[in-house]
Amino acid sequence: MAAAGGGWAAACEKFRSARTLSAVESRKDPETEPYRSKYSARALLQEVKQQLSAAEDCGEARLLAVRRAVLEYELGVNHTDTEELSAGEEHLQRCTQLLEPHRLSRDCVSLYIQAQNNLGILWSERDEIKTAQTYLESAEALYNQYMKEDGNPPLDPSEHFMAEEEKLTDQERSKRFEKAYTHTLYYLAQVYQHLEMIEKAAQYCHTTLKRQLEYCGYYPVEWALNAATLSQYYLSKQCFMESRHCLAAASVIFSQAGQVPSTEDNETEQDQQDLRQRKAEIARCWIKYCLNLLQSARKLLEDNIGELDPDRQLELKAQRKKEEDEKENGRKKAVLFGTSDICDSVLAMEEKVSSVYPLDFQEAREIFLVGQNYVQEAKEFFQVDGYVTDHIEIVQDHSALFKVLAFFEEDYERRCKMHKRRIDMLEPIYADLNPQYYLLISRQLQFELADTYYEMMDLKVAIGNRLEELDSHTIKKINSLAQLAIKYYELFLDSLRNPDKVFPEELEEDVLRPAMVAKFHIARLYGKLITSDSKKQLENMQTSLEYYTFLVDYCEKHPDAVRAVETELELSKEMVGLLPTRMERLRAKLCPFI
């Protein structure tokens, strides 16, 4: 067939036209005929296939087999694109069968890997993930074997239908081959994620992202979102340096997205909306980063009553000073993204926020402020009107940032003001929320508001204890905060009642601990209310006893619940033993002659 120059040139032209129809013209197909160009491409490929069949007796068996394999591959992808998976599978299988004896040769290896990639995708779409894994791992192994045994840039499949003078340079061949292998790793990352092999999925995702930058084969928005998602994996492993690096790279690469002109002007408005949403999603990942770093530092620094341990703080500061010199070496071992110019931008981005545990208020505040900036950025897109759940989650994260910052603040008054900021942001959104439609979020807000008022009350009591005598203003404030905490805890507990307002005999596992903690805190809050009226004091003690008793009785009836509230149960048992005696003493004072 090579000798029949005119016929071969025509076949090459048809092949090129088919690829153009599939890759370019198909984008312009009307909605009524979404696959018009794909079907036209298929017809051309079938014509070329017939021409090859007619030339089978020309003696160039190996060459013809490879060219037929290219056509089977193109037809396989074409049928898959038009959702004809069975036909697509047949063509792709024929492709690999034709190439099997020569799969490690320079003219076949790239095509064989791409066919296996597409078989992997095809089986993934059928939800046969294990089968997909087999094909993709086979493609990965073949790439590694070829690079070890040969390593020269192999032919691109399209070159089998090109004149000699049109053939690609080695540089272009290498780029296309590496891109095919990057796709293998990308699909493997998804397969491992699906199979819940999370660590392996993260490793493959990181390698894919790195290679996409190296070979300039990526869409900025998609790349940035994948990097931001990967950052959350590293966050779950407490690998803050790696998490920050992924997020910094995501922000830098995302900034390129606005510089890429839209291919279709009529989609520009939607494109801009999508860009704003993606930017807000990356901002939310940054919020989680700052919040997790602060919360992890708190766990390291807190004592057994949840306060900052000064000895532990000094110990960690000394340890960190010792490790400063090793920091640079560790940095170089981290997997870095991109070429030198991208690396410079990423490193500049990283310098805006620490990746080491903050050990005092000033360090914590710097991380808090970065997180707060991203809260504002995320809220610009995720507004209450249209994104209720997302908006509330962002506000909850903002509240959590204030909560953890308050831990580092030594001054009780200033700490109280931080909790007041939380109240000011949470109460308005709770007031506007319909619990009928947003029951879970409503419960979360009730509990958080109750907890915040509870914490403020504790702080006001601690401030009052420093005074020689409690003044009426402080007493009023303590009582007001306690009553507001009780109000929100009761609202939370009421939300657990059935339509007949009856509290459940047995609590669901997801609400067991919050409900028990709410009961325990209400018991304690009634004990904290300050009154000069002994009768009222007795009533409060009685209510307090009832709530403590509920917790003790519930755990006796449901022993499985004990693990969830061990500390609270121990203290409740103690109070159930002490309170009746105290109440008797108080009654004796009220009625001395009885």
From Swiss-Prot:
GO terms classed as biological process: central nervous system projection neuron axonogenesis; microtubule cytoskeleton organization; mitochondrion transport along microtubule; neuron projection maintenance
Superkingdom as given in the UniProt entry: Eukaryota
UniProt keywords (A-Z) are: Cytoplasm, Cytoskeleton, Developmental protein, Differentiation, Neurogenesis
Q: Which Pfam families match?
A: KBP_C (PF12309)
Cystine links in this protein are none
The protein's GO terms of the molecular function aspect are: kinesin binding; protein sequestering activity
- Assigned protein family: Belongs to the KIF-binding protein family.
| Protein name, UniProt field | KIF-binding protein
Q: Which organism is it from?
A: Gallus gallus
The protein's gene is named: Kifbp
